[in-house]
Amino acid sequence: MLVARTKKELLDALTPLHTQQRSIGLVPTMGALHSGHASLVAKAREENDVVVTSIFVNPLQFEALGDCDDYRNYPRQLDADVALLEAEGVDVVFAPDVEEMYGPTGLPMLWVRTGEMGERLEGASRPGHFDGVATVVAKLFNLVRPDRAYFGQKDAQQVAVIRRLVRDLDFPLEIRAVPIIRAADGLAESSRNQRLSGADRAAALVLPRVLFDLEERAATGQPLDIEGARAQLRAAQGVRLDHLELVDAATLEPLTVTGALDRPALVVAAIHVGQVRLIDNIELTPR
């Protein structure tokens, strides 16, 4: 397995593979890898000749372009991540620093703007977040030129934004969304889970419980009670609700449903537990 720290090292490794018409799967990550990332790599390994994984904590998608505690405290464990990726059969790891990605200033002159799609839900709480995501992903697509790229369904809005990026900018690749991986207690796997204390993790379990209840209601034809779900999260000790919304599964446009659900939908949510912000979602299928 090659670990490329520069764009030149990456391109030197990939150019012969493109010449040989080997299929390439890209798994973009910010490191602090877990079983959810491993599932992305496994899917990429299954569908491609070559798997490339990027590890880059992207300051552009954090508050104040990374000048914040969330960016500074984001888990970084490159050696452990590289060992995991080698065990999972990854061929190339691209692990640049900020200057390598964005030049001496650490900021690009040109950005991808995601507009209204990137300004609601997660984007309302994290202004500019999806512009930063789309910008770095566009750069990775240009550098790697993958046939397929793999993202976790846990970040449902990110998946929708990236699909739109590919469509609007005519990137010649497929986007694969891989189902959420959950721990035995139901919590969605996330790099941020490392920062939860035992008490915080116990408090956070209210989120999957609320989502599973909504899933059951949809599947059995019961009326959805979105406001009741919000109330449960607001009342939970140690938890602060950011948002919980019912949206169209494809467009993420808000949905208003009275009575039983009559179309596929998604519930997306974010909460704060201690100093950690967690996101989750669940697909709802009507009876």
From Swiss-Prot:
The active site is at H37. It comes from Corynebacterium efficiens (strain DSM 44549 / YS-314 / AJ 12310 / JCM 11189 / NBRC 100395). It is found in: Cytoplasm. This is Pantothenate synthetase. Pathway: Cofactor biosynthesis; (R)-pantothenate biosynthesis; (R)-pantothenate from (R)-pantoate and beta-alanine: step 1/1. InterPro entries: Pantoate_ligase, Pantoate_ligase_C, Rossmann-like_a/b/a_fold. Beta-alanine binds at Q61. Gene3D superfamilies: HUPs (3.40.50.620), Pantoate-beta-alanine ligase, C-terminal domain (3.30.1300.10). The lineage of its organism: Bacteria, Bacillati, Actinomycetota, Actinomycetes, Mycobacteriales. It is an enzyme of class 6 (ligase). It catalyses: (R)-pantoate + beta-alanine + ATP = (R)-pantothenate + AMP + diphosphate + H(+). GO terms for cellular component: cytosol. The reaction proceeds by a bi uni uni bi ping pong mechanism. It holds the Pfam family Pantoate_ligase. The gene is panC. HAMAP family: PanC. Belongs to the pantothenate synthetase family. The keyword Membrane does not apply. ATP binds at residues 30-37, 152-155, 181, 189-192.
